[in-house]
């Protein structure tokens, strides 16, 4: 009841009682049907708590509120926006990102799951088995509106076939290079050597810019692809130029600072 009272005068104007429950008149704001706020037994619905939570966010003047929903909950978005309209709340800074489902594969076989039968594989299970970093890397690799096939065997593989391992190995190589040489990042750089590795240097210089761009676009998958591309470029250059040079030192130092 405190939640419903928190909606203020709007609650009185835009609700009605039906079959012992209290309903919100969201159809007046382009929702496909009115929504229950309080059940017959007086218990609040998830909808009421979500509306109250977002109202609190809006009232506290948050710059941005990002909601991440499963794609199967896309119908929930108009319900919430209708509630904001009912309350005459500006919701321009509230964003909704929809993510598709994840399919787990082990030994080439898709793992079947059913909540009804109590058969499922939790994220905590994956974390214990693989560690959090590799999970984040693979889960962020796909664009949110694309389904994902997560290969558990590939995630465990310690070879260049595993993009996460390959990216880590690039960082290890950077650290190894810096540990073997004395390098002052403020010293003059041999421009001829820079010309020979323009691609890798330009990627390093552009990293802060693309990071900001990906954040504003809400596209973490683009950052993962940038890391994969940079790692491949670095490994290729390293293998072609095994001898320490100004370019390798400069790039390694920059990569270490930005990792």
Protein language model features and the residues they cover:
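Cationic, low-complexity basic patches in intrinsically disordered or flexible, solvent-exposed regions
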Residues: 2
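Non-catalytic interaction-recognition regions
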Residues: 5-8, 12-252
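A short, hydrophobic C-terminal helix/tail in secreted or cell-surface proteins
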Residues: 253-259
């Amino acid at each position: 009841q405190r939640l419903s009272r928190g909606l203020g005068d709007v609650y009185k104007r835009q609700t009605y009682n039906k079959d012992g429950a209290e309903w919100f008149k969201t159809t007046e704001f382009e929702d496909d049907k009115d929504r229950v706020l309080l059940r017959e037994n007086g218990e609040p619905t998830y909808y009421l708590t979500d509306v109250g939570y977002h109202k609190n966010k809006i009232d506290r003047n948050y710059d941005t509120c990002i909601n991440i929903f499963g794609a199967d909950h896309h119908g929930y978005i108009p319900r919430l926006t209708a509630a904001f309209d009912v309350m005459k709340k500006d919701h321009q800074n509230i964003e909704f990102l929809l993510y598709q489902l994840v399919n787990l594969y082990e030994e080439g076989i898709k793992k079947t799951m059913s909540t009804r039968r109590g058969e499922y594989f939790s994220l905590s299970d994956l974390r214990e088995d693989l560690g959090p970093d590799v999970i984040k890397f693979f889960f962020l690799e796909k664009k949110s509106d694309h389904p994902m096939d997560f290969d558990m065997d590939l995630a465990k593989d310690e070879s260049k076939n595993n993009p996460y391992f390959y990216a880590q190995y690039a960082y290890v190589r950077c650290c190894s290079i810096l540990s073997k040489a004395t390098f002052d990042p403020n010293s003059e750089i041999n421009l001829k050597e820079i010309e020979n590795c323009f691609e890798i240097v330009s990627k390093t210089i552009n990293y802060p810019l693309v990071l900001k761009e990906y954040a504003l676009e809400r596209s973490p998958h683009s950052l993962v692809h940038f890391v994969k591309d940079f790692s491949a470029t670095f490994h290729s250059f390293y293998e072609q130029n095994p001898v320490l040079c100004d370019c390798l030192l400069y790039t390694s130092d920059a990569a270490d600072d930005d990792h």
